[in-house]
Amino acid sequence: MKRGMMFVLGAVLLLAGLALLFGRPFIAEQAFRRALDTNVGVDQSAAFADGLHLYVCGSGSPMPDADRAGPSLAVLAGNQAFIFDSGSGSIRKLGRMGFPMGKLRGEFLTHLHSDHIDGLGESLLQAWIAGGRSSPLPVYGPEGTDKVVAAFNAAYQIDSTYRVAHHGPKVANPTGFGGAAQIIALPDGADSQVIYDQEGVKITAIRVIHDPVKPAFGYRIDYKGRSIAISGDTVYAPAFVAASKGVDLMLHDALNKDMVAALGAKLAERGQPRTAQIMHDIQGYHASPEDAARAGKDAGAGTLVLYHLVPPVPARLIEPLFLGQAPKVFPGTLKLAQDGMIVHLPAGSKAVEFASGL
């Protein structure tokens, strides 16, 4: 009896193994079909409530980071979408998050450091093709933005001719290629100015402190009673705090000086003086987590999210070390940005809801 049971059990296991082995192509195809139905061509934002929605597609810095792309954020306000900086790798993550490129109205550069613009070419390309543009994308930024945009347009010009020839003008309308620079020049003595005001969306450029990079800007976005402030790269900047009063959500850059100093010391010890010098220099023009927490507190921000994280924070175990005393300084919700994070601020509400878009 026992032998019979063992034989039956063995036969069942053998058949199950054979089914699994030879059924793999079928299972794989079904999984592929489900992924097509769920993700491809689906505007994930169509299910969002009216309001402001922040996409974190790049929470990292120039330092190599397997988990975080270069600095980039995107905002959806009703039917209008905007990108703030385009760090390396960020635009591909934004695509994975289902960002509605067809609603993109413009890109806003905080400043012209390479890590904030090295993905601009890809951003303009996606705006043109995926967004179906018939005119160049407006790119707002400080003095010099015209040179940067012209250079990216030139670099991608040959590629654009291939795409028009291959896909035709209905897919790649030649008049929609590239970017059109819009220079932000604040009046003398002014620390902030509204630079975009359309269909209920107001975007304010704010002077921040990132010397020797001048000018450098943060931005505030207002829509239907909800608000987001984005610092860009800066130390604690009183003008940014003043212009961010009462925001629902503040995004602020953060650099842990003790950790960066330790990196610099190790680099010097290992005979890399140039990189060690950079680790010393960058401490003077970024906010510490405590500085960012103070900015959020002084502005009365409801929620504070730290991004442009220096150095990389590869595991949650390290987050308390990176944050230092910041949680004691900022009285509200405080988080480290993660690529793929989406923050929902529904209109007519005080809610701040976190979700994952990856």
Language model segments and positions:
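Binuclear metal-dependent hydrolase catalytic cores
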Residues: 2-228, 316-353
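Residue-level structural signal for beta-strand termini and adjacent loop
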Residues: 87, 233-234
